[in-house]
């Protein structure tokens, strides 16, 4: 029996901070809002749906947390149609963290699938880059807000 390969976005990066700190950066919106979305209705908790907002674009999304393993793994479902986003945290011997983000479950085909994979790969890469700058150096790069300035794109409308 042949296995069909599932289209998956995968991005990764070494973050020079302890795994517990990197993990909390995704659980706690008081931290996440420094590098990703601008507002959240709450912390990630299993079985709970929160709303993430990007106020500069006047868009929001509902995020369902499916699974959490402290300092190891977070699985969420979000988007329309919904896809799964897994965050995998691996502690490295030097006290840093290797973070992997996987996004899969796309109900698209052809050019629409290619476009979604491309957009989400770029988007999650931007998230990790912002996280790295913030946690390692305390710098808020404003990458998400600068990705689609009003003057060049009518994003989300």
Cite the ranges covered by each PLM segment.
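Generic structural detector for well-ordered beta-strands
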Residues: 10-14, 53, 64, 88
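Short, highly charged C-terminal tails/helix-capping segments
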Residues: 133-157
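Glycine-rich portal/gate segments that line the openings of hydrophobic small-molecule binding cavities
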Residues: 39-84
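A short, structured loop/turn motif at beta-sheet edges
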Residues: 19-20, 66-71, 89-98
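Beta-strand/loop substructures that line and gate deep hydrophobic ligand-binding cavities in soluble
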Residues: 77-126, 131, 144
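Residues at helix-coil transition
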Residues: 27-28, 37, 70, 129, ...
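Hydrophobic ligand-binding cavity/cleft-lining segments
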Residues: 1-41, 157
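Hydrophobic pocket/interface hotspot
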Residues: 22-26, 32, 50, 65, ...
């Amino acid at each position: 029996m042949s296995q069909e390969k599932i289209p998956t976005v995968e991005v990764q990066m070494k973050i020079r901070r302890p795994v517990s700190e990197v993990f909390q950066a995704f659980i706690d919106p008081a931290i996440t809002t420094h590098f990703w979305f601008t507002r959240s209705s709450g912390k990630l908790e299993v079985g709970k749906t929160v709303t993430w907002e990007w106020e500069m674009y006047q868009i929001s999304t509902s995020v369902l947390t499916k699974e959490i393993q402290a300092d190891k793994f977070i699985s969420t479902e979000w988007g329309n149609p919904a896809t799964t986003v897994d965050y995998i945290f691996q502690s490295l011997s030097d006290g840093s963290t290797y973070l992997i983000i996987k996004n899969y479950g796309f109900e698209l085909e052809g050019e629409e699938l290619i476009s979604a994979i491309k957009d989400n790969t770029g988007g999650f890469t931007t998230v990790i880059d912002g996280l790295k700058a913030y946690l390692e150096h305390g710098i808020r790069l404003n990458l998400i807000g600068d990705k689609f300035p009003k003057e060049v794109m009518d994003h989300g409308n």
